[in-house]
């Protein structure tokens, strides 16, 4: 049923004006949705919890290998040009980096929970790093 704009009217002391009712015939003529089914949506948080369980079970690397390798080479360019890396060296750097990030996010989550929140914020990361002694 279409909404109509309501305007203030001066009362004449009679009955209040009623909303117009749409007849059954008018409803049938109205364009239907065509029976289009809405896509299924999980409740908020369900998919997040499923992803948490999935990634806690797994041991594979979460950062793609080639973008990480490009990042390592880009950072190394600042120190010395024409550096070459063994594949195992890049893999060791990636393992260490991901282990560090996972531990940092765990501590960050604890800081957010301590503040009675479930959403992590930059200030939680800063607090976690400060408690660890990484950043004065």
From Swiss-Prot:
The modification Phosphoserine is found at residues 11, 58. The modification Phosphotyrosine is found at residue 42. Keywords: Acetylation, ADP-ribosylation, Chromosome, DNA-binding, Hydroxylation, Methylation, Nucleosome core, Nucleus, Phosphoprotein, Ubl conjugation. The modification N6-acetyllysine is found at residues 5, 15, 19, 24, 28, 37, 116, 123. GO terms for molecular function: DNA binding; protein heterodimerization activity; structural constituent of chromatin. The modification Phosphothreonine is found at residues 4, 7, 12, 81. Acetylation is generally linked to gene activation. Acetylation on Lys-19 (H3K18ac) and Lys-24 (H3K24ac) favors methylation at Arg-18 (H3R17me). Acetylation at Lys-123 (H3K122ac) by EP300/p300 plays a central role in chromatin structure: localizes at the surface of the histone octamer and stimulates transcription, possibly by promoting nucleosome instability. It is found in: Nucleus; Chromosome. Its main location: nucleus. Disulfide bonds: none annotated. The keyword Ligase does not apply. The modification N6-butyryllysine is found at residues 19, 24. The modification N6-methyllysine is found at residue 5. It comes from the Eukaryota. GO terms for cellular component: nucleosome; nucleus. The modification N6-glutaryllysine is found at residues 15, 19, 24, 28, 57, 80, 116, 123. Pfam families: Histone (PF00125). The nucleosome is a histone octamer containing two molecules each of H2A, H2B, H3 and H4 assembled in one H3-H4 heterotetramer and two H2A-H2B heterodimers. The octamer wraps approximately 147 bp of DNA. This is Histone H3.3C.
């Amino acid at each position: 049923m279409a909404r109509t704009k309501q305007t203030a009217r001066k009362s004449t002391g009679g009955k209040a004006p009623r909303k117009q009712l749409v007849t059954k015939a008018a409803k049938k003529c109205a364009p239907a949705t065509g029976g289009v089914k809405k896509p299924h949506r999980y409740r908020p948080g369900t998919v997040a919890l499923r992803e948490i369980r999935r990634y806690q079970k797994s041991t594979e690397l979460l950062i793609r290998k080639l973008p990480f390798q490009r990042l390592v080479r880009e950072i190394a360019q600042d120190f010395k040009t024409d550096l070459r890396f063994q594949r195992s060296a890049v893999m060791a750097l990636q393992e260490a980096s991901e282990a560090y990030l996972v531990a940092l996010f765990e501590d960050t989550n604890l800081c957010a929970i301590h503040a009675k929140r479930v959403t992590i914020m930059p200030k939680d990361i800063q607090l976690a790093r400060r408690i660890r002694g990484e950043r004065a």
